[in-house]
Amino acid sequence: MEDKNKEKINVVELFGSNVFNDKIMQERLPKKVYKELHKTIDEGKELDPITAEVVAGAMKDWAVEKGATHYTHWFQPLTGFTAEKHDAFITAPHADGTVSMDFSGKELIKGEPDASSFPSGGLRATFEARGYTAWDCTSPAFVREDSAGAILCIPTAFCSYTGEALDQKTPLLRSMQALQTQTLRLIRLFGNTTSRKVTPSVGVEQEYFIVDRQKYLKRKDLIFTGRTLFGAMPPKGQELDDHYFGVIRQRIAGFMKEVNEELWKLGVSAKTQHNEVAPAQHELAPIYAECNVAADHNQIIMETLKQVAERHGLQCLLHEKPFAGVNGSGKHNNWSITTDDGINLLDPGKTPHENVQFLMILTCILRAVDRHADLLRESAADVGNDHRLGANEAPPAIISVFLGEQLEDVLEQLISTGSATHSLKGGKLHTGVKTLPDFAKDATDRNRTSPFAFTGNKFEFRMVGSRDSVAECNVVITTIVAEAFSDACDRLEKAEDFELAVHDLIKEYATEHQRIVFNGNGYSEEWVEEAKRRGLPNINSMVEAIPALVTDKAIQLFGKFGVFTEAELRSRAEIQYEGYSKALNIEARAMIDIASKHIIPAVMRFSRNLAGTVNEIKTAGADVTVPMNMLKDTTALLSQTKLALAKLQEAADQAAAMENGREQAEYYHEVVFKDMEELRVPVDKLEMIVDKEEWPMPSYGDLLFEV
């Protein structure tokens, strides 16, 4: 029965209601100040102190009207999470004991968090504490409401006292500048004189798991590490394919409804929601936005999912592989290039063989991905992602590009004859049912096994881990494409005959880099062998991927476009090695703790009770074969568990004693992780034997199917 008192949501009014967006700025800022601020946002003009002061006052008044008592410089350090420090708007008490609410231009533009307390990879020592946050006016400020009240959040970049980037946003903004410069160079050669601004546009599909919070709190492995370290598969997993796009459960639907409302208030255009492949797995996707805004929005999405879940008695799991035996989670990064006058430069049009500018851009991107496949793979490297990539549930660890039949055919024409004369058409889809409409098919199918796939008017990078910031992969994509555009412009700007030169260059790039194009099954063993024959790198783990950051090629690339200095790259490599080691150390210690304090005692109690049962049956003169065999199996597995536990303890101690860096990370990867897997095997077998009432934590079945 419909609840007539249920509040109806006006999405149009709700959307952006907690965002200091362009509409609010037009209403609250003097025209001159509004224009000056937009010169900074649109053209990169330096913001003068007087303008900043007026903007700060208007922003404070708006936020206070929304109930805000504090503000924070909201930034993204290299921890993988966002960071914030809350400062109240109140001034020092006046002579009469009262206070005012104040917020200055200086407070808007600059903050000073402790840089030594965040990962810096050696860029900052403990005694070198000063760091700065700087307002990113291209990403709107917003008011976040939670149990602490309302807080004005100001998106900022974070750098050290000496100017090195200590965050995800700074290099992303640098890479966007580089792409704009080189793209404008390129499209000017094709006669475009109207576009003044170019930005990468990004839409991020976010996968996640939802479980009951009370059950989650009984799983110390989930609490400590974000994933289950032990767990036998339930009778049913995802093999029936009945969860994907299935009817959303009422409890989950209520959670999703509140998530949408919270995101809409914050200006995040949450568009799509559905069940994913694995039980208890779901996806949320917003409409695309400018790259740096999309990266901020994805952080807001992850925070909102976690906060709203708790309010519903649920727990959101963002780990890439919270459960063995079913699909893990990732995020798809949909990337395109758009101009301020509405042109999508990755739109091939209806006749791509005639769209020379598009073909130049396309072959430049092929060149970029082929030359820097190692960097692209590294941008998705994560300790949790190691469980997914190449495991027939996510793209393979081998970077390749899917173009589809239409564009592959155009490139083959270019390579074989030097020109393309036609484009394949999609035709009509006929269902054979008169009451169903016939409609035009796309010119090509989709390939879910490809890590970097062209999907009509954008590229979809599918390797990113579900917890990770999308800033890192977009820094790489944007910079390597900027380099390819720059190289092309260097050639074309010198050409005496532009038309001839551009056709020759398209053919050259298509020919040189055709090895990166693969439209087949990325999950197959045949592709692994074929990729090896083509000379494509197959980087299977995070530890193997990190060195790509500090090759001469990478240092030259990022240095040329001002995205990273060599010192910044080396610091990020060190941070990643250290982060990998710390994550594995926590997982190993958690396994040791859970096995020692919970699982082994529970199995011993079960064995003692089983032994008593054997004796009672024997006394009664009945057959003890079944309970005796159970007891033998249990004690044998318990012995294996104890041996594996001791082995893991020794390896974890040895790893922890090593100096931080590559060697330690490699030891964790090659020794400690394998010992963890070895311990899990007998424990998961014991779970299938021991009485459920005796087992010390909820099972996979409890977590995945009781939501």
Where are the language model's segments positioned?
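C-terminal amphipathic alpha-helical interaction region
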Residues: 506, 511-707
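Catalytic pocket of metal/acid-base enzymes, prominently hydrolases
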Residues: 2-34, 48, 130-135, 140-154, ...
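Active-site core of metal-dependent hydrolases
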Residues: 14-129
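Active-site proximal loops enriched in glycine and acidic residues that flank catalytic Cys/His/Asp
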Residues: 51, 75, 104, 286, ...
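Short linear, low-complexity motifs centered on an aromatic residue
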Residues: 80-96, 113-116, 121, 219, ...
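Composition- and surface-driven signal marking solvent-exposed, interaction-prone regions
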Residues: 222-223, 298, 320-321, 347-351, ...
